[in-house]
């Protein structure tokens, strides 16, 4: 049936109908004008990091438009930043929705937000650094949306998104520069990220066992780049660390070139154990210096040169150094890390084209001179001695009569051995002598260093090789050092998920210096300038087998020319690192290393030296006849003394680690590691002292005086003749020890919402060195830490955005320390045949102590990290440590030994550290940074049941004295009660 249409204007007159139509036309025209006016309305917007829904509500409240959308379509779109001035609504919406899968339609006063109808595309690829290493946890995101992916442990990523025009991808990783890539239709996109010069929060920290983002660590760790501390005047990295890290004290103990400095981190935690930090290179622990049997000729300088743990390492091969200071950072290294850990990371191979690099430098130092010191000249020195005599200042002993010192000259005059004319004439000679000891004994130091490196490779393999040579002529004449280093490293990636790194390192070192009693710089700074350098003046001396010896002739230049020391060492190591990315979140890593270290050392004093005359002869060289009584009382009438040391140390280190790393989103991350480590170190050495050594006659050995021919002068002491037996037996000693270690460890780091971080570490070292109690054989070390990054809170970013980083952290942990050559059992030294019994003899070295246990240190650490305007960076830390130290207890002589070691001392350390860095210029290729650091450590003894005798305070044993409430290594003296009025 056909429907009939009804007119709306039926029943109305034509005139009325025309009026109504005209009204409708006016209303429609007015409505169109209003809609066009709204669309052309211009507004200003300034919003940062808001959700899309918040932006739409903001626009709706400031315009006449109503927005309609499905909540699920816009729920995941956040971090919208819009900054517009006098722009239309369409311009603002275009900017807000750019890079998303959303579009909009305007219908009257309504704006509808809806999804685009597009097909999906899948994008995948690899994210690596410049050396070709995978960047697990790196993110790729679509600009303007939450879409994207997180790279797995092998650096691979994949995700699907709706196809759209102008798609822009952003790749980022902590410590790396962000990279943006415009999508051009290519479904596989591989990206290489460059290192960033950004602030500390963006760093990746190398702890030795793992690499982890700075923001996920709670412990006290300072990382420095090797390129920032390289100084041409230093040849080893330990010297370059001086003054660079708060809480770490680097002390140069000698002016001799090649000598390792003493390094101490956060005070002293042990009295009798090793106080040096643990050195780790590419995750492999470097063994302690070789233990030597020091003699009078074996100076500490030479021992430090021999025993430097990283003397083989060329600073040019180093990428970065991490200093681990608190328990949270060091607990993973167990019983060897109570003094802190210094972790060195060497440079990685790059996948660039062939590159050849050569660097060299030449350094000329200054020679010391008297203008630098407020020292007296000869005339002032003579005047001072004259005034001291006139004031009646007593001498500690009668001056030796001689013409070469004012005191000796005056004694001769007062004894009427010379006339007044002779006295005045010689005094004038002394006043005008002005010997320049600095000119005679020192020189301008000169050194030159050369480094050559070659590197290159592809994505499948890469390689690098380097050689270094350095030579240093020390400030003291006669002190020289020379070193050659070499390194070869290769990286192979046979498949995408497997990376193999192998390296070989080698070095050769030689050093020439002085015997024990020869110190040119010390002599120059303390010796009277009125002394003629060519004369042999009389120096106080004694000889036990001739009571008439009061002095012997001494000349420093003669002493230097007829004695000396030299050392030569070689080092070779090989390492293998295999990393297998089993899953995107799971990696297995094997690390193995082997090292071989050999050294040969000599120190000697010839028969022409004061040292031999005083200790073995009793008279000056060639000053008596063979028939004289002085000759017959000499232990060593001919020849000098030669000390030799040959050592061989080899060790291996095997680690197996399984690492879990999962980023659940941009804000939550979990890192976990479990592993085991097996280490073994073998030390072999021979120390030998030979008497009768004549270096200037073909290095022959002459025979000492026989026991039958030895005739001490009447009235002299007759004890100590056993030195003849030692001379004939020789000082031969052999060392052959092997130390094995087995450890298991685990770490955990969880970051929640990029604001709350929890760290936990545990390690268990087993040893049968400590007691029969099984609880003492195991040393579990553990730590816990928590941090709150307040700057990531929304209210902080909104109201105080100029605070770019604010982090509060605290840690607690327990560390252990195992003293070497210490046992709970009875130790006997098996000696040679005793003449009295004609049987082998043994002596007690250590009595049993079944309760002996590890030294343990409990540590608290609190820190604040603050960064302002991306320019100022401040770190403030406070720590406190309590150590249960092993001390030495004196024993009655009936025990057969004078002392024993036992647990019983408490050491307290507390301190504050402060670092301020200002970086006004920070570009990709260059930066300007100024840094200031300061620290203060207080230590004192706690409760101890060990009694300290008065003699211990006054005889120079301050390094082992532990007195409650007083600092360690204090200077002690008797209190002055005043003058006795009765006397």
Where are these regions (language model features)?
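Hydrophobic, well-ordered secondary-structure scaffolds
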Residues: 301-303, 737-762, 769-770, 774, ...
